Amino acid sequence: MARPPRQHPGVWASLLLLLLTGPAACAASPADDGAGPGGRGPRGRARGDTGADEAVPRHDSSYGTFAGEFYDLRYLSEEGYPFPTAPPVDPFAKIKVDDCGKTKGCFRYGKPGCNAETCDYFLSYRMIGADVEFELSADTDGWVAVGFSSDKKMGGDDVMACVHDDNGRVRIQHFYNVGQWAKEIQRNPARDEEGVFENNRVTCRFKRPVNVPRDETIVDLHLSWYYLFAWGPAIQGSITRHDIDSPPASERVVSIYKYEDIFMPSAAYQTFSSPFCLLLIVALTFYLLMGTP
């Protein structure tokens, strides 16, 4: 009679040991986040280094979290297509009128006592190294500009304008007046440009070199010029005729090396301040006091 094959207890013991230790070995794999002290954490640090790792937030669902974060960084257009959000923009630094006549020159046009936020038109200038920094602001939703002229009339003038476009941005553009028409010049001397449209006002700030290579469309600011002040509406980012028929201008040529704070009353506030009106008031008063013959 044949005898059954003899079983070796050592083989069964080895199989039993493998079954018992297999799950633990898999759980302790160094490639897994649940590894023991000899493994590496999610930041590549040894698991023995406790403390800092515990503060790292863990995603319950990596796909869901990524999708949520990705959607938060995007917005949908009216057609439903996603676009990247606009980059953050530093807030526009408020124009300081307290420095007028001290560390910068200023021109104010409008109501007596007005400032950069309430004047019909405001301009400041100051030297910064080899540049002149200009600040412009006007009560308009279109454009505000300053022209540098050899006289007080438009024509043959170098003009810097801040234009509010249809995208809500304020761009600094360079023009040259040909008669009553402003021709945009591609060569723009402006640098460090910034602008904002708030409270129905266009406000901007930019720098421009004092000395420039000889060019009929760009004047040297180290020379003195009459300053022409203008503002008006814009259509699709293009400037149109200024708001008033006779834009104000500086009474005399302006030197960028001399800081003054000059106020010019607008038409609504200069009725009784012009020499003619004052003379008329004196004549009427004298007539009333003397009486009629």
Swiss-Prot record:
Assembly and oligomerization: Component of the outer core of AMPAR complex. AMPAR complex consists of an inner core made of 4 pore-forming GluA/GRIA proteins (GRIA1, GRIA2, GRIA3 and GRIA4) and 4 major auxiliary subunits arranged in a twofold symmetry. One of the two pairs of distinct binding sites is occupied either by CNIH2, CNIH3 or CACNG2, CACNG3. The other harbors CACNG2, CACNG3, CACNG4, CACNG8 or GSG1L. This inner core of AMPAR complex is complemented by outer core constituents binding directly to the GluA/GRIA proteins at sites distinct from the interaction sites of the inner core constituents.
Biased composition annotated in UniProt, kind: Basic and acidic residues: 46-61
Positions of the UniProt region annotated as Disordered: 29-61
Compartments where located: Cell membrane; Synapse
Protein name, UniProt field: DOMON domain-containing protein FRRS1L
Ranges of residues in domain DOMON: 119-234
GO molecular function: dynein intermediate chain binding; protein-containing complex binding
Gene that encodes it: FRRS1L
Function: Important modulator of glutamate signaling pathway.
Cross-referenced CDD domains: DOMON_SDR_2_like
Keyword Transmembrane helix belongs to the record: yes
